[in-house]
């Protein structure tokens, strides 16, 4: 929902004609780079038109220029029924954007020597094993599933865990490894990017096992609180209902989200802008170094360079580093992105690494 306008937002920020990618609005202003006043006026008019045209109940966004929060604003309603307005501080279901924070938490553990990116997942989750038609030695298949491959969607695991017909999906990360053991690989690990929610769920289980803390607690203590992301949580009920947006699917019905905390990040555009600014500052937030510079660089380094079947799709640790099916920015400006669509919600985060610009749009 509303994804078509996210990349043109960055075109506007750059002062290019990228704003023209937002039909049917009037011509965009020819603003100088760094002069955001006219661009913001233009976007405010166009966003309202597009929300009405696409029947979007509520939306919030943030625009970042390096360490500056250029603009953050909410439009429409967080709760249409009770006429509660959306703001830049409203928490939306961020869905797959959680993977950016999970990758960051994994890199933190690697920095402390608590795990290695190239170590097999099975070293941490010893009860977990896979089945493979690609390996004569099944233990070789288990050893091929590393944290690096999990974080870059190259583990070979299927996208989701489909329980047996009369089975139950695990309702906690502690149960997950045993419940999904014996899953068949979809392709050989390290040969192809294939998006896997299951892979990240297992990384979340490994974070719990490695730290001895509940996943939500570890993420709060090591990322959310240090970044002052006060409107963010991996535990939905930790945020008051008044701070959260209602999700609406077709027909205006409320949407629902995942039951596992790794997929249940709630956050606001302003909070996510703090995460982005930390990355732009090479892992530093105010006086605290949350990630080392080399970890941030590793996050943005292509991990799938040798995969012929990935063509021009470049993937870092969590981040998609090239379009991978999305539209290019005008002029071929390089951008990194992550997008999410869950029942009733949409979120999109785009970075321009050379220009140190970012746009966060949540609806």
Stretches with model-predicted labels:
Residues 1-8:
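Bacterial N-terminal signal peptides that target proteins for export
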Residues 17-18:
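C-terminal motif of bacterial Sec signal peptides marking the signal peptidase cleavage site
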Residues 41-47, 61, 67, 93-121, ...:
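Active-site SXXK
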Residues 75-79, 132-343, 347-348:
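Short, surface-exposed loop or secondary-structure junction motifs
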Residues 117-135, 226-227:
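Short, glycine/proline-biased beta-turn/loop segments that scaffold the active-site neighborhood
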């Amino acid at each position: 929902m509303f994804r078509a306008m996210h990349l043109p937002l960055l075109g506007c920020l750059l002062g290019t004609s990228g704003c023209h990618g937002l039909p049917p609005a009037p011509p965009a202003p020819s603003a100088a780079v760094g002069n955001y006043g006219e661009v913001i006026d233009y976007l405010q008019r166009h966003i309202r038109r597009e929300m009405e045209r696409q029947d979007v109940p509520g939306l919030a966004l943030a625009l970042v220029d390096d360490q500056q929060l250029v603009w953050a604003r909410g439009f429409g309603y967080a709760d249409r029924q009770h006429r509660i307005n959306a703001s830049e501080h409203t928490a939306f279901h961020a869905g797959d954007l959680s993977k950016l924070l999970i990758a960051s938490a994994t890199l933190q553990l690697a920095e402390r020597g608590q795990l290695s990116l190239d170590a097999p997942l099975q070293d941490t989750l010893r009860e977990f094993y896979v089945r493979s038609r690609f390996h004569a030695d099944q233990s070789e298949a288990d050893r091929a599933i590393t944290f690096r491959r999990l974080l870059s969607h190259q583990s070979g695991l299927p996208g989701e865990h489909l329980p047996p017909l009369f089975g139950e999906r695990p309702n906690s990360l502690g149960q997950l490894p045993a419940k999904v053991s014996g899953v068949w690989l979809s392709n050989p690990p390290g040969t192809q990017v294939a998006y896997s929610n299951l892979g990240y769920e297992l990384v979340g289980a490994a974070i719990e096992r490695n730290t001895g803390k509940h996943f939500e607690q570890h993420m709060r203590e090591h990322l959310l609180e240090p970044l002052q992301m006060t409107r963010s949580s991996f535990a939905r009920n930790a945020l008051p209902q008044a701070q959260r947006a209602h999700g609406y699917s077709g027909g205006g019905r409320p949407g629902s989200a995942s039951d596992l905390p790794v997929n249940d990040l709630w956050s606001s555009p302003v909070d996510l802008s703090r995460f982005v600014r930390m990355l732009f500052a090479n892992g530093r937030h105010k006086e605290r170094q949350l990630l080392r510079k080399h970890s941030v660089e590793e996050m943005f380094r292509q991990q799938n360079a040798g995969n012929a079947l990935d063509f021009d799709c470049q993937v870092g640790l969590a981040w998609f580093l090239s379009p991978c099916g999305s539209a290019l920015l005008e002029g071929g400006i390089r951008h990194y992105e992550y997008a999410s669509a869950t029942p009733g919600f949409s979120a999109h985060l785009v970075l321009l690494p050379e220009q140190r610009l970012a746009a966060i749009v949540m609806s």
